[in-house]
Design a protein with these regions (language model features):
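Helix-start (N-cap) detector for alpha-helical repeat units in TPR-like alpha-solenoids
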Residues: 54, 87-89, 120-122, 137, ...
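Canonical tetratricopeptide repeat
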Residues: 93, 126-127, 160, 194, ...
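Structural signature of tandem alpha-helical TPR/SEL1-like repeats
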Residues: 68-75, 100-112, 134-146, 168-177, ...
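Bacterial Sec signal peptide processing site at the extreme N-terminus
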Residues: 17-43
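Alpha-helical segment of the N-proximal tetratricopeptide repeat
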Residues: 49-89, 93-100
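Terminal, low-structured helical/coil segments at or just beyond the last alpha-helical repeat
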Residues: 27-28, 32-36, 195-261
């Protein structure tokens, strides 16, 4: 819904552009594929020296993170900021690395620091991923909705929002963002995994199996999707009961007001 709330974990690491700027970096998301999409850490750290321009250095740090070298990337972020100063891009990369090294509180602080910058969408996205990782899918939905409002065509954000809504039990609310994500980025394995999860939640098991066959999902990914489908089904039952109770309460108040008259 890898959404990182998105490297979300199927979540799933998305190839990032090396150019610096407001749209240079994106959090990876979560969902049925997040773990499967993480690149394995390199056997040996890269030996190339630090680039001599800010853009090249940020590109190197980003590449290290995509290779799973999160601790090393934190050291290089420190070096970058010592040489060039703190920037929104370096803060975003720090937030990502902190999240991927199980430093959730520090990661959240870094993501929040982005909210008043051109990378506010990435900040909300990251906060949503952290909330989802902590099991707070209602909070994840709120943060991801803000992210999607700021970046309405970002497929990863929409996919993570749809996944978070599924985990919150709001199957109907998950449909539109997931369909948007599927059309915006039809080749994304993470998006397709979350669409399969939606189909299962809608009771369309045959279509879900067909899509998994077409996309050649591995047995491990299919098992992850099935596990998530069970959680979504349980959440959907609770969501239905909760919304039904809310409607009953409204009707009761309306009836009471009518009787008073």
């Amino acid at each position: 819904m890898k959404t990182r709330m998105g490297r979300v974990r199927p979540s799933v690491a998305v190839a990032l552009a090396f150019a610096c700027g407001a749209c240079a970096f994106k959090p990876s998301g979560y969902g049925a594929l997040a773990q499967a999409e993480r690149a394995a850490a390199q056997a040996a750290a890269e030996k190339e020296s630090a680039p001599d321009t800010p853009g090249m250095y940020l590109a190197l740090i980003d590449r290290m993170q995509r290779q799973g070298l999160y601790y090393a990337s934190l050291a290089h972020i420190d070096a970058y900021e010592k040489q060039y100063g703190v920037t929104p891009d370096s803060t975003f990369l720090r937030a990502q690395a902190l999240r991927d090294t199980a430093q959730a509180r520090a990661s959240a602080e870094a993501y929040r620091a982005l909210l008043a910058t051109p990378l506010a969408a990435q900040g909300y996205h990251g906060l949503g991923l952290l909330a989802g990782a902590a099991g707070d899918f209602r909070g994840a939905c709120r943060a991801l909705e803000r992210a999607a409002a700021l970046a309405p065509t970002d497929a990863a954000t929409l996919s993570d929002l749809g996944y978070a809504r599924l985990r919150e039990g709001d199957v109907a609310g998950a449909r539109v963002p997931l369909m948007q994500a599927a059309e915006l980025d039809p080749k994304s394995a993470r998006v397709q995994a979350n669409v399969v999860l939606l189909l299962l939640a809608q009771g369309r098991a045959k279509q879900a199996r067909t899509l998994m066959d077409e996309r050649q999902f591995t047995p491990a990914v299919r098992a992850a999707v099935r596990d998530d489908a069970g959680r979504v089904a349980q959440a959907a039952r609770a969501f239905k009961i909760g919304t039904g109770s809310a409607h009953d309460g409204f009707d009761a108040r309306t009836s009471s007001e009518g009787n008073d008259q």
